[in-house]
């Protein structure tokens, strides 16, 4: 595994992608932003992924649940952390994700990522 963990960041808002990339890269992770569009999403080719941040409320024609299933199929060992303004993990996501962080709490986000990545490395 690489010494620098890579975090796949999935959101439909390019501003949020930029912000979360800055946050994860501020502590040495490598941010890999993927924007969800009406055409779907394109995962990076040949890039290792150690963890995934996934926005729960996507405005395009795909749900976070469907995206999480795609992520698990492509990166089965990468833990998924849901980012949301809701208060708890939705039932349909509970068995798929390993973390949940409310938006606006970068300290908790980084703590969660560090813990999950440390378990893998």
What are these regions (language model features)?
Residues 45-47, 70-77:
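Conserved phosphotransfer cores of two-component systems
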Residues 54-69:
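Conserved phosphotransfer microenvironments
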Residues 14-32:
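Two-component/phosphorelay signaling modules centered on CheY-like receiver
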Residues 83-84:
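Hydrophobic/aromatic residues positioned on beta-strands within the core alpha/beta folds
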Residues 1-8, 106-121:
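Non-catalytic signal-transmission and effector/linker regions of two-component phosphorelay proteins
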Residues 92-101, 105:
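As written
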Residues 52, 80, 100-101:
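Two-component signal transduction core modules
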Residues 32-51:
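Acidic, metal-coordinating helix/loop segments flanking the phosphotransfer/catalytic sites
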């Amino acid at each position: 595994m690489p010494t620098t963990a890579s975090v796949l960041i999935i959101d439909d808002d390019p501003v949020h992608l930029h912000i979360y990339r800055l946050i994860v890269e501020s502590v040495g992770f490598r941010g890999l932003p993927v924007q969800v569009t009406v055409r779907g999403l394109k995962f990076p080719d040949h890039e290792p992924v150690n963890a995934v941040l996934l926005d729960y409320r996507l405005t395009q024609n795909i749900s976070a649940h469907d995206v999480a299933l795609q992520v698990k199929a492509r990166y089965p060992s990468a833990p998924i952390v849901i980012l949301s303004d809701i208060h708890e993990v939705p039932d349909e996501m509970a068995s798929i994700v390993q973390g949940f962080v409310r938006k606006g709490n970068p300290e908790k986000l980084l703590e969660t990522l560090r813990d999950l990545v440390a378990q893998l490395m």
